[in-house]
Regions:
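Small-residue-biased structural context
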Residues: 1-228
């Protein structure tokens, strides 16, 4: 599968590229973080049920983003720096991006419980501002990764090394949320990306997702996005 980006990653002979799954994860972060400020802004005062629902969604995204960043920093940049003499300026920009994201996530973590407790509109408005800033900075960071880093993956990583990175990044996902993550990755996938991803899912898990998981994902996201 050839993943279309500003500067596409190099394809292997069978038409796939190692970084294709990371591109799908990036789509999840972009979409969900972009939508979250509007969803939070739409919560009326005292609607603690909606605040709690969106709070859980934010925490899941924040946990996923932190694990993704740790795997990216520990297993991606270092190896590329060793093997390709990764531009120190690019590496420093990526590190700055992570520090910026960590600061914003820390602010959100500190305020979220206050908002979930009583859905106070003043706290809500502050959250919206920070969530908007986070979404913008993360999207910019992911674009830089896709254009300046991922094109090097197929040339300098083995399948085993890339699998190790993927397992590290996905280490946060409990078994009962695997179907959610699969649904999230498939939501904006192209036909080629969908075939490539589903081809890596074990047959029993693929069948279970099609029988139960897909419907559960759609139902959950419809509830979450009800006010979008």
């Amino acid at each position: 599968m050839i993943v279309t980006m500003t500067h596409p990653t190099p394809s292997r002979e069978n038409g796939t590229c190692l970084a294709s799954d990371m591109v799908l994860v990036h789509k999840v972060f972009r979409r969900e973080l972009r939508m979250l400020p509007a969803l939070v802004a739409a919560v009326e005062p005292q609607r603690v049920d909606r605040a709690a629902l969106l709070g859980r969604h934010y925490r899941e995204l924040a946990t996923a983003l932190r694990h993704h960043h740790h795997a990216e920093r520990d297993l991606l940049w270092g190896r590329l720096a060793q093997r390709t003499q990764l531009d120190p300026g690019i590496e420093e920009r990526m590190r700055q991006g992570h520090r910026q994201h960590d600061d914003l996530l820390g602010e959100l973590d500190g305020m979220l419980d206050l908002w979930v407790a009583d859905a106070d509109p003043d706290v809500r408005d502050l959250l919206v501002d920070i969530l908007t800033e986070l979404a913008e900075h993360v999207a910019e960071h992911l674009t830089m990764i896709e254009t300046r880093v991922l094109p090097e993956v197929d040339r300098h990583f083995t399948q085993r090394e890339w699998l190790t990175l993927g397992l590290r990044a996905a280490g946060w996902i409990p078994l009962n949320r695997m179907a959610w993550m699969l649904g999230a990755m498939l939501e904006d996938a192209t036909d080629a990306e969908r075939r490539n991803l589903m081809g890596k899912v074990p047959a029993p898990a693929r069948l279970l997702y099609r029988m139960v998981g897909q419907e559960q994902y759609v139902r959950e996201m419809q509830e979450l996005r009800a006010a979008a």
